[in-house]
Amino acid sequence: MRLNPGQQHAVEFVTGPCLVLAGAGSGKTRVITNKIAHLIRGCGYQARHIAAVTFTNKAAREMKERVGQTLGRKEARGLMISTFHTLGLDIIKREYAALGMKSNFSLFDDTDQVALLKELTEGLIEDDKVLLQQLISTISNWKNDLKTPAQAAAGAKGERDRIFAHCYGLYDAHMKACNVLDFDDLILLPTLLLQRNDEVRERWQNKIRYLLVDEYQDTNTSQYELVKLLVGQRARFTVVGDDDQSIYSWRGARPQNLVLLSQDFPALQVIKLEQNYRSSGRILKAANILIANNPHVFEKRLFSELGYGAELKVLSANNEEHEAERVTGELIAHHFVNKTQYKDYAILYRGNHQSRVFEKFLMQNRIPYKISGGTSFFSRPEIKDLLAYLRVLTNPDDDSAFLRIVNTPKREIGPATLQKLGEWAMTRNKSLFTASFDMGLSQKLTGRGYDSLTRFTHWLGEIQRLAEREPVAAVRDLIHGIDYESWLYETSPSPKAAEMRMKNVNQLFSWMTEMLEGNELDEPMTLTQVVTRFTLRDMMERGESEEELDQVQLMTLHASKGLEFPYVYMVGMEEGFLPHQSSIDEDNIEEERRLAYVGITRAQKELTFTLCKERRQYGELVRPEPSRFLLELPQDDLIWEQERKVVSAEERMQKGQSHLANLKAMMAAKRAKS
């Protein structure tokens, strides 16, 4: 498939800063991969001097695969394609000395972070989960805005901010003492380092001679600053983004970064991609008219050559049960008549709580479905156990990981033993693992607890020494040495569950072996690099799944971004749901409108909206108004279902069950014939 004129221009412009305004479904990934190929084949760039960054591992993997197909593995070798956080991690790994760190640092995930802050803030904030979550979000926002604990304290307004800034200081000091980083540090530390250290900045500007950034509208303050520091005065970069799809302000994303580009880089070339290869003309007309109600710095209007398409439907339901029943009935009928697959359908909603009633009706009617946001492979307990072992091997200062493994499997090392070990370690300013080797510890600890502890840590020390020479053998010995398979069979609810968990362990070992040994495209990694990469993948892949089964897709509008489906149901189109009540209260309607725009532009062929006349909220019955966004759409292209005679819940249930029973009978008859 040839590039269109806009795509071709975006690929070939390489002489200065470039912003590609890529509308939904306009083929931006093709532009990025073709531009990388053009830089290497047409402009003389070496692959190792080009970096492309995006926001998810899935997007980075897809880009890597496409570039590999276009260029071939040999030509693409050395090319840096990663997420922002992986790029930050690479900078930290190479520049740890300049940051005043040890090379064997660990990464904290959100579970570690919650546990540590809970411990550090005892007596400072009440035992309040909501307040703790607010503290975590505030620390994250401070880091994203490049604020150190001292700067946070200096700018604190009010008592709560002062307490939070103090907690941030305690947290930061503890992280440094344990040689541990959290997710936000992976952007904060490289950015501060490049700001302050001319030599390091120059080294990275020479290393990355052309930078490409995907989903630019999702960047926050620190990410934008990192981009500016990496490109420097040379300003050889391409950023691809869409201000109309900026829906992550609650995560610190700043769509105004697109506007700042033209101020910070006056020579910026703006190229628009407006041809959509996904949706019908009618769907795009609705999206264009809706989003035109938001103010724009860069105007663009999507168009399609895929035909005008089916009218958009609006279904009205009496309440949320009726809404789910109607969507399920419509979906079954459509699936039967059009001989489609279940994975062609998506049900999109504003909040996760809306999915439950849809699950109920899909389940009752034996419709296979999948809710996005399932358990990441790296979040599974067996994987976290093994990664905790490896974290201690590669960073003996990681107390959080040590406490996870010390009794996994059970070793008769009780709380009293661990408390005394903790007191001993604290007075000597050592980690728990390191302190366990102290000669004088035998005076503090005695009996079975001491014997079990020293037996365990000395064995782990042997594995640690083996890991320095033969990491693959060390990991194999570790899994066998703790007899982890027996432990899984003892603690799993069934032998089948234990078998599946052991299969996951073997999968992890297989991936680890590949990464330690390297391949045509990737250099061999050290064990430390492998462990930090896996921990980062866990944090970034929550809810991502590679498996594609024939299932109806249920997901939030936020989770749907970047995806496409032939048939889309946008449910709960009511004031208070979309737009969300908190956004109405905070006058943040523009972002909610962008969210509706994202939902509409997921649909390829048909789009159906649903709304309820009544809903139960917080135990009360409310009568919501139709969403203003429905009223902003071109009414000539909408079919609002005619009002029907009001029937009782019992009559409706009988009628609905009869309708579904007829459809199921038709499907059964069809299966019997085939």
From Swiss-Prot:
The protein depicted here goes by the name: ATP-dependent DNA helicase Rep
Q: Where is the UvrD-like helicase ATP-binding domain?
A: 1-280
What NCBIfam families would the database entry show?
PRK10919.1, rep
Q: What does this protein do?
A: Rep helicase is a single-stranded DNA-dependent ATPase involved in DNA replication; it can initiate unwinding at a nick in the DNA. It binds to the single-stranded DNA and acts in a progressive fashion along the DNA in the 3' to 5' direction.
Q: Give the EC class as a word.
A: isomerase
Using the record's annotation, list all stretches that form the UvrD-like helicase C-terminal domain: 281-562
Gene Ontology MF, one: single-stranded DNA binding
Subunit description? Homodimer.
Q: What is the organism field in this record?
A: Salmonella typhimurium (strain LT2 / SGSC1412 / ATCC 700720)
